[in-house]
Curated annotation (Swiss-Prot):
It comes from the Eukaryota. Changing D39H: Loss of hemagglutination. GO terms for molecular function: carbohydrate binding. Homodimer. Changing F126K: Loss of hemagglutination. Loss of homodimerization, but retains saccharide binding. It comes from Mytilisepta virgata. Galbeta1-3GalNAcbeta1-4Galbeta1-4Glc oligosaccharide-binding lectin. Binds strongly to the oligosaccharides of ganglioside GM1b and to a lesser extent its precursor asialo-GM1. Binds weakly to asialo-GM2 oligosaccharide and to the glycan moiety of globo-series stage-specific embryonal antigen 4 (SSEA-4) hexaose. Binds galactose, N-acetylgalactose and lactose. Does not bind GM1. Does not bind to Gal-beta1,3-GalNAc (Thomsen-Friedenreich antigen), the oligosaccharide of GM1a ganglioside or SSEA-4 tetraose. Does not bind to N-glycans, O-glycans or glycosaminoglycans of glycoproteins. This protein has potential for the detection and control of certain cancer cells and cells of the immune system, that display asialo-GM1. Has potential clinical applications since it recognizes glycans expressed specifically by the target antigen for Guillain-Barre syndrome (GM1b), natural killer (NK) cells and basophils (asialo-GM1) and glioblastoma multiforme (SSEA-4) in vertebrates. InterPro entries: Ricin_B-like_lectins. Highest expression in the outer part of the mantle rim. Highly expressed in gills, with a much lower expression in the digestive gland and posterior adductor muscle. Scarcely detectable in foot. This is GM1b/asialo-GM1 oligosaccharide-binding R-type lectin.
Length: 129
């Protein structure tokens, strides 16, 4: 596996160039294709479970609960993500949820997850500072 950014990073989609964001004050989670804002900076950390990572922001964790992508107050198996390298797109990954085996994706401005590999599931993580 290529070098992965651990720590503060942006999570940017290959297909539309949008970056994942979460704003606690507005309780707003999604993807934004415009200017870079602080609410797009995530904490990407190795979990205690080998091969899995947590994606957090504002003391919450990105979670797929089997129906929707949301933010959780508690680190649990549904907040763990593995990385699958995309060989044809160097540096890009698919983020796979540990429990539901669904890939992080987007639909319009919303973060979603699905079980079928698509072009819109390719993400790059790059250092925020």
């Amino acid at each position: 596996m290529s070098s992965v950014t651990i720590g503060k990073c942006y999570i940017q989609n290959r297909e539309n160039g949008g970056r994942a964001f979460y704003n606690l004050g507005r309780k707003d989670l999604g993807i934004f294709t415009g200017k870079m804002y602080d609410d797009q900076i995530w904490s990407f950390q190795k979990s205690d479970t080998p091969g899995y990572y947590t994606i957090g922001r504002e003391s919450k964790f990105l979670q797929y609960n089997g129906e929707q992508v949301i933010m959780s107050d508690i680190e649990q198996d549904t907040t763990l993500w593995s990385l699958e390298e995309v060989p044809e797109d160097k540096g890009f990954y698919r983020l796979l949820n540990k429990v539901h085996k669904a890939y992080l994706d987007y639909n319009g401005g919303d973060l979603v997850a699905n079980k079928h590999q698509t072009e819109s599931e390719k993400w790059i993580l790059f250092k925020a500072y």
